[in-house]
Amino acid sequence: MASGCKIGPSILNSDLANLGAECLRMLDSGADYLHLDVMDGHFVPNITFGHPVVESLRKQLGQDPFFDMHMMVSRPEQWVKPMAVAGANQYTFHLEATENPGALIKDIRENGMKVGLAIKPGTTVEYLAPWANQIDMALVMTVEPGFGGQKFMEDMMPKVHWLRTQFPTLDIEVDGGVGPDTVQKCAEAGANMIVSGSAIMRSDDPRAVINLLRNVCSEAAQKRSLDR
């Protein structure tokens, strides 16, 4: 079985001048993990932060929070060890960014991290299939990666459904434009890891939003198990 429904706030939409406090606010509001977007200005047209920030967050937040690193970088091989040393728990790289996913998966595992594999909206989901049994999580982007606050792409849901059908025990994450108005579609398609940025970060009651997202996801998962 997949690991259950989990909600990971994307800190891309947080007050970056108070990043540690923002992460604590999310964890105190019931977040299951933190989704950390690393962008290099090459793979995507934006720059965020790198492993020194991750190391600082780990020192401030302690060992318990799970850091899911979304590596939107053109050379994901370069940052495996630095991210592992900094305290990352999962290294999610883009299939489009490497010519040798197998070697990269092996390197990530040897550095003690879980493996996530992401695909952009324009990438055919079947290209991910050869690696599905070697990874811990598949990430289906529901916006073009690079910036927060974009409109959710509902036409990505068949990819999620295909992955859930073909690989029923795989963790499947969705990222981009996901919030209370769109999570139902994601959950019904089969996603069990929900990344949400603006909807949580900009809410007056982030705990309520996180609980709503988790409840919708859990109910859909329960219905799928009953329908089998």
UniProtKB/Swiss-Prot annotation:
One of its GO terms (biological process) is pentose-phosphate shunt. Substrate binds at S10, H70, G146, F147, G148, G149, D175, G176, G177, G197, S198. Its cofactor is Fe(2+); Mn(2+); Zn(2+); Co(2+). A divalent metal cation binds at H35, D37, H70, D175. InterPro entries: Aldolase_TIM (IPR013785), Ribul_P_3_epim (IPR026019), Ribul_P_3_epim-like (IPR000056), RibuloseP-bd_barrel (IPR011060). Binds 1 divalent metal cation per subunit. Active with Fe(2+), and probably also with Mn(2+), Zn(2+) and Co(2+). It catalyses: D-ribulose 5-phosphate = D-xylulose 5-phosphate. Signal peptide: none annotated. GO terms for cellular component: cytosol. The modification N-acetylalanine is found at A2. The active site is at D37, D175. Its EC number is 5.1.3.1. Disulfide bonds: none annotated. Keywords: Acetylation, Carbohydrate metabolism, Cobalt, Iron, Isomerase, Manganese, Metal-binding, Zinc. It is an enzyme of class 5 (isomerase). This is Ribulose-phosphate 3-epimerase. It comes from Mus musculus (Mouse).
